[in-house]
From Swiss-Prot:
Top-level taxonomy: Viruses, Riboviria, Pararnavirae, Artverviricota, Revtraviricetes
Post-translational modification: Specific enzymatic cleavages in vivo yield mature proteins. Envelope glycoproteins are synthesized as an inactive precursor that is N-glycosylated and processed likely by host cell furin or by a furin-like protease in the Golgi to yield the mature SU and TM proteins. The cleavage site between SU and TM requires the minimal sequence [KR]-X-[KR]-R.
Organism: Human T-cell leukemia virus 1 (strain Japan ATK-1 subtype A)
Protein name: Envelope glycoprotein gp62
Further facts: HTLV-1 lineages are divided in four clades, A (Cosmopolitan), B (Central African group), C (Melanesian group) and D (New Central African group).
GO cellular component annotations of the record: host cell plasma membrane; membrane; viral envelope; virion membrane
Stored Pfam families: TLV_coat
GO BP annotation list: fusion of virus membrane with host plasma membrane; symbiont entry into host cell; virion attachment to host cell
């Protein structure tokens, strides 16, 4: 029985060596001075996942940029899609003796701070560009505005890659490095960046402390500055510590490496210190020494001066525009009345000429009737002379012809109304109203001026207000930021 137990114990001891050590590990993604651990992954569970925020990545990379003048990500780029470009300079072999991949000339090699060519000339397929990476198997990601979920195969952990926003102009680029690592001995105590209720210790009410610090800052500046709190990655947070409190020499675990640590030996806080900071390793440690305080980065911005609003500008402009419109309307009315008067005189002259022509036609018609009567009288006399031969037509051996003069067209011509009554003037409305021509034209001009004045009063202030606010929409005020360390 003892031999069986000894054999069983040895079997369980050497079982990891036989079947492989599948202890939990992860893939660490590094950008700037910050590191992000993936969810547990190993060769048996090869998918390494991250949930990242693009704004936080930009803040992390800004602390230690890989190249100068790198364009940062902002809300302007939120509508554009991401592309992932792996760097395939060396292909690792975890069994030892790594080897280089085949040479590959990529015309879209990343350059700072731009991608070197247009997106439609790049030889990428889908969302990833590499001759050795497959999008669905080796890496895939989903993007929801500024939120990014990356799934990387564990065999590809160790490759650096870049994220690119394909936006017009300079494209924001993130340079990320990955390496396999072990999970930290304890779970990360830091909560997501957007949660300011509890940091490191859930029992500390951070909302009230932040409000107290903001109130003290406002009082120290005599309420002449705006206090801004940067909710970036936790690695960019600042630490205030008291060098008067010693740190225990016992072994402690580093929890957070802040980007800035400021000694404050004579600072009096409205509450006690909450964390333990080790100045030798520049990190927040797990020892309960309580000599420091972790704060998000503060920035002070001067309050913009509010310019006095001139309320007389709009009424003066309205009255000026109204006066100009009224003057233009009066001038137009006078010009129109004069043109109508000249048109009326022209119609009168044309009507006089038509009446004279009508009288001449009537006189000619009467003369023609008299000539016809004379011809008929002579015809009857000649018929009497040639009575014995059967009349004038028989004697001449011709067909008899009789006059047929109609008298119906001349009365119609005389009954037509004058030309002035048949031509419409003004607005095309034949409204008489028992008024003279000048009175009708004055009434039309007055109605036009009233309508124009009402239009200016209703629409003028709105148009002037929009034109007045147009420069402020195009030009944004820029205020210089005062770093918090300058006030400490």
């Amino acid at each position: 029985m003892g031999k069986f137990l000894a054999t069983l114990i040895l079997f369980f001891q050497f079982c990891p060596l036989i079947f492989g050590d599948y202890s939990p590990s992860c893939c660490t993604l590094t950008i700037g001075v910050s590191s992000y651990h993936s969810k547990p992954c190993n060769p048996a569970q090869p998918v390494c996942s991250w949930t990242l925020d693009l704004l936080a990545l930009s803040a992390d990379q800004a602390l230690q940029p890989p190249c100068p003048n790198l364009v940062s990500y902002s809300s302007y780029h939120a509508t554009y899609s991401l592309y992932l470009f792996p760097h395939w300079t060396k292909k690792p072999n975890r069994n030892g003796g790594g080897y280089y991949s085949a040479s590959y000339s990529d015309p879209c090699s990343l350059k700072c701070p731009y991608l070197g060519c247009q997106s439609w000339t790049c030889p990428y397929t889908g969302a990833v560009s590499s001759p050795y990476w497959k999008f669905q198997h080796d890496v895939n990601f989903t993007q929801e505005v500024s939120r990014l979920n990356i799934n990387l195969h564990f065999s590809k952990c160790g490759f650096p890659f870049s994220l690119l926003v394909d936006a017009p102009g300079y494209d924001p680029i993130w340079f990320l490095n990955t390496e396999p690592s072990q999970l930290p001995p304890t779970a990360p105590p830091l909560l997501p960046h957007s949660n300011l209720d509890h940091i490191l210790e859930p029992s500390i009410p951070w909302k009230s402390k932040l409000l107290t610090l903001v109130q003290l800052t406002l009082q120290s500046t005599n309420y002449t500055c705006i206090v801004c709190i940067d909710r970036a990655s936790l690695s960019t947070w600042h630490v205030l510590y008291s060098p008067n409190v010693s740190v225990p020499s016992s072994s402690s675990t580093p929890l957070l490496y802040p980007s800035l640590a400021l000694p404050a030996p004579h600072l009096t806080l409205p509450f006690n210190w909450t964390h333990c900071f080790d100045p030798q390793i520049q990190a927040i440690v797990s020892s309960p020494c309580h000599n420091s305080l972790i704060l998000p980065p503060f920035s002070l911005s001067p309050v913009p001066t509010l310019g006095s609003r001139s309320r007389r500008a709009v009424p003066v402009a309205v009255w000026l525009v109204s006066a100009l419109a009224m003057g233009a309307g009066v001038a137009g009315g006078i010009t129109g009345s004069m043109s109508l008067a000249s048109g009326k005189s022209l119609l009168h002259e044309v009507d006089k000429d038509i009446s004279q022509l009508t009288q001449a036609i009537v006189k000619n018609h009467k003369n023609l009737l008299k000539i016809a009567q004379y011809a008929a009288q002579n015809r009857r006399g000649l018929d009497l002379l040639f009575w014995e031969q059967g009349g004038l037509c028989k004697a001449l051996q011709e067909q008899c012809r009789f006059p047929n003069i109609t008298n119906s067209h001349v009365p119609i011509l005389q009954e037509r109304p004058p030309l002035e009554n048949r031509v419409l003037t003004g607005w095309g409305l034949n409204w008489d109203l028992g008024l003279s021509q000048w009175a009708r034209e004055a009434l039309q001009t007055g109605i036009t001026l009233v309508a124009l004045l009402l239009l200016v009063i209703l629409a003028g202030p709105c148009i002037l207000r929009q034109l007045r606010h147009l420069p402020s929409r195009v030009r944004y005020p820029h205020y210089s930021l005062i770093k918090p360390e300058s006030s400490l």
